[in-house]
Design a protein with these regions (language model features):
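HotDog/MaoC-like acyl-thioester-processing domains
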Residues: 1-64, 145-204
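Hot-dog-fold acyl-thioester-processing enzymes
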Residues: 34-140, 200-204
């Protein structure tokens, strides 16, 4: 379905503003924040992410706050992003997603950041989910000492923030950070992953 993103005009001295996504019929899809500088008051940073008791869960009961989801030495290639760009598969394509001369390197589209900062730790989560149907929940991408240039090596580190459940899903919140060769934190992602209870053998 076609959607549009609406960004509130920030006050002159503001570092953050509200954003939302709506369908063409006006139905609200999601809300969040966008900002520069300190992001401690972002939409996700201010969520109450206290964990439930893992023993209350049936699917994610072996995951717990602080549990490592692995460290990964990764070369973040621009090849797939350039292919998507050329095929017209990137919404709102920017030249810096392909042209390295603008900022001294190729910058990632949001989908490329997620491809890496989600794509590796999900390998550690997948054995617990097994054949259950997974859904993306909330996502926050932040750049601390960017840019997060492509065609470079990074170390990704990921760990569980908390686990919990709703009537229809079990969910995990986790954080992944990307460090450059000098061990500076360049980027981070907070992700909520949901698993449908009805799709799991643990609920049958």
């Amino acid at each position: 379905e076609r959607v549009k993103v609406i960004v509130d005009i920030p006050k002159p001295d503001a570092e953050q503003t509200s954003v939302r996504m709506e369908r063409e019929d006006g139905m609200l899809v999601c809300t969040g924040t966008a900002g520069v500088g300190n992001h401690e008051r972002s939409a996700l940073q201010t969520q109450d992410l206290r964990s439930c008791e893992p023993k209350e869960l049936r699917i994610l009961n072996k995951l717990y706050p602080g549990m490592s989801l692995g460290q990964y030495e990764v070369f973040v290639s621009a090849d797939k992003q350039i292919q998507r760009f050329d095929a017209g598969l990137i919404s709102d394509p920017l030249e810096c997603y392909k042209d390295s001369s603008l900022f001294g390197g190729i910058l990632p589209a949001p989908c490329t950041v997620i491809e890496y900062l989600w794509g590796y730790p999900i390998q550690a989560i997948a054995p617990y989910i097994e054949e259950s149907v997974g859904l993306f929940g909330a996502i926050e991408i932040a750049f601390q000492n960017g840019p997060f240039f492509l065609n470079q090596n990074y170390q990704l580190q990921s760990e569980v923030i908390c686990v919990g459940q709703s009537p229809q899903t079990e969910y995990i919140w986790y954080k992944t950070i990307a460090l450059d060769a000098s061990e500076r934190q360049i980027a981070s992602m907070i992700m909520q992953g949901r698993t449908m209870k009805a799709s799991s053998k643990a609920y049958q």
